[in-house]
Each structure stands twice: as C-alpha cells, then as structure tokens.
Amino acid sequence: MTNLEKLQEMIDNSNNIVFFGGAGVSTESGIPDFRGTNGLYNQECKYNPEEMLSLSFFIAHPDEFYNFYKNKLLSLNAKPNAAHFKLAELEKAGKLKAIITQNIDGLHQAAGSKNIYELHGSMHSYHCTKCGKEFDMDYILNSKLVPYCDDCHGLVKPDIVLYQENLDFEVLANARREIAKADMLIVAGTSLSVYPAAGLLDAFFGKYLVVINKDMPKKDLHVKLYIDEPVGEVLDKITV
C-alpha cells in the first residue's frame, strides 16, 4: 500500500478526525513560513522578527510594528489552497470535527470550515487597547500607518498572540478537549517547536496519528503514518 492509500483507509475508518496545522498548511497559498528558507527569520531586518512581534515592542514602537505587520505579515491576496478546501469538505461530510491552527490568516474560514480553534489569534480582528472597541481589517487598511480608536484614540492592536503574551486559555482548553475526543489526528505543516501549542498533542489517545510535513517533528510521537510531501498535494488526492 502507498502512503496515500494508507491515509485514505485511515480516514475512511475514522469518524472523529481533528486536524492540527501550522505554517506549512498556508505556504501553498503563497504565505511564507516564518522559519522556512524564505521566512521572516532568515530576512535581514533592523530588529529580529521575534522582537518586533513582541508586546513590549508593539507598545514602545507602534509605527515600526505596524510597518512590519502591514508589509510582512498581512497576506491580503492569499487564497485557500487544496488543503483548506479538502478539510472543509471533510467537515461537511461529518468526518472532521475540528481544525486547530497556529496560523492567523483566516484561510480555513475562507474555504468554508466552521469549527476552528485559532491558537495564535487572527489578523482579521482588532481591538482598542484602551476602551476595548472592536475593529475589522478594513479599519486598519483605511487608517494611516498606526490605527487609533475612533472613539477614545487608544492604540488599536491586532487580535494575534504576540511574544510575551499568553495563548487564550479557553481556546487552548477547547482544542485539548477536541484532541482528547479524536480517533484520528492529522498533524500538518508544523515542526511542533512552539509551546504550549505543541503540548496539546499529549492529549491524543486515538487510533491514528498522521504527520504530513517536510521534516518529522522532533517531539516524541507515536506516529502511525509519516508523509514527507506538501499538505495540499496530499489532501487533494483524498476522496471524501
């Protein structure tokens, strides 16, 4: 049996699939992986990305933060790829119960998926750090470099988890609950190097753990199937 045939059989035999995805899921949509060859971590910048994407940097240098954010992070022209669409199809068929993503791009929603846990937040929503008023992407794009609240003039922040910030406890708890209930877990496009997100996999005691990634994650996993190919190419060949 080929790896694809094995994957198809596992999906056919599962009724509670959870998908856990990282940056590699969106690279086929043209969004570079932070840690990949062409990623932000390998580009020459005045500050390193980890510093620029920290809460303290956002507060101290909102202009430089937003310059970096708008030019390097916002992926406005990206469209869902085959992986996003196939996952939405699997959810519609009642096979896939949840998507847990480390991405902030909103491409799973754009493809039609409903039950999504965004561990690192979303670039599609924003809030005033002073009064809490909520804003959408259009407000940010139509504002000058740094967006300020139209009510209280407070600094507006993206609803993404920056370095020095904790992940949302409720999102984490719900994601862990979904993984604990799963009979199949597909881990794709992530090196599982970021905690506490990577620790969520410890909650999985189901039958099939599948990894689709360029490299096998360093984390010790009881993997049933490992596929070293682009996520979209693999999932595109799956029949629902």
Residue positions per predicted region:
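Conserved catalytic core of sirtuin-type NAD+-dependent deacylases
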Residues: 1-240
